[in-house]
Curated annotation (Swiss-Prot):
Residue ranges, Cytoplasmic side: 42-52, 113-133, 202-226, 292-308
This protein's name: G-protein coupled receptor homolog FPV206
Tree of life domain: Viruses
GO molecular function terms listed in the Swiss-Prot or TrEMBL record: G protein-coupled receptor activity; oxysterol binding
Species: Fowlpox virus (strain NVSL)
Intrachain S-S bonds: 89-167
Residues passing through the membrane, by range: 21-41, 53-73, 92-112, 134-154, 181-201, 227-247, 271-291
Database matches in InterPro entries: GP183-like, GPCR_Rhodpsn, GPCR_Rhodpsn_7TM
Keywords carried by this UniProt record: Disulfide bond, G-protein coupled receptor, Glycoprotein, Host cell membrane, Host membrane, Membrane, Receptor, Transducer, Transmembrane, Transmembrane helix
Keyword ATP-binding assigned: no
Sites carrying sugar chains: 2, 262
Keyword Transmembrane helix: yes
Cellular component GO terms, alphabetical: host cell plasma membrane; membrane
Amino acid sequence: MNFTGDCLLYAGYEKLSLSLAVVTILIFSSSLILNISALVIGFYTTAPGPMKMYLINLIVSDILFTVTLPLKIDYYYYFFNWRWGEMACRIMSFLSYINTYVSINFMTWISVNRYYAVTRPHKYNSRDNIMRTKIACACTWVIILVPMSSILFVSTTSSDHETKIRCMEYNKVGDSMYLPPWVTIVMCFIGFVIPFAMMAISYSAVCYTVLSGISKSTRSYRTCKLVACILTEFVICFLPYHASVISYMIHIITSKTVLCENVSYYQMLLHATQCLMKLNCCMDPIIYLFVSSYKSKAKSNSIKLMFK
């Protein structure tokens, strides 16, 4: 497999760059308001429990990533020109990957938690699960943080023929990957495909239990809706990006020559699908507010008033 050499990745994509900047501004504004609101409501209006712990961890991850979005807005506004130095690029990239895979893992934990709550209600005890939930949360952060921290120690910027500095992008096709394509595919399989399969199985079991009448409580129906919302968010936010990465890695493995225009298209596709991934920062707090709204009638009314 051969590469075509130096490549101007973004020739002709000026309008798309500005569109990405506008979309990211909207995501940043919405995410900041929603996540801070959800965090405040979470601390003051809901009792401790596994669901709260998972969702609070999601929100913390979203906030950490949201504060880096102004840098991404600047990058898009100046037509993919990074003006903030090497370390800022590393930190932004690090938090982006952390948010993606921490979110995927906690969304998977939530679905599994709901699976046991609905299909094994006699064995499920929220209080007994709190310690296990704490351990799961701690392990999730460690497992994601340790390998991703390598990003902080490698160069993440590069320059091209236009004398612009790119962040986490490469003007030479042959430099477009840190890892061999097959390793990237394996990582996508572990980080996305397996969690997606677990969520789909949990969702199917929950809905089967509820719709078959095995568990007829109102709470069970709400759980079915919750897991469906989480699965929908998962598909919208994370499936396009990982499908794009996997398909391109397969293209590299199977093709004798990778053309510049293919790489350019892939880079823009990554930016577009990454915008979809950023949407999870807005959707996570909405799901949290959805869950919190059922705790009591008074709390439900206060949450609804926020959105009038």
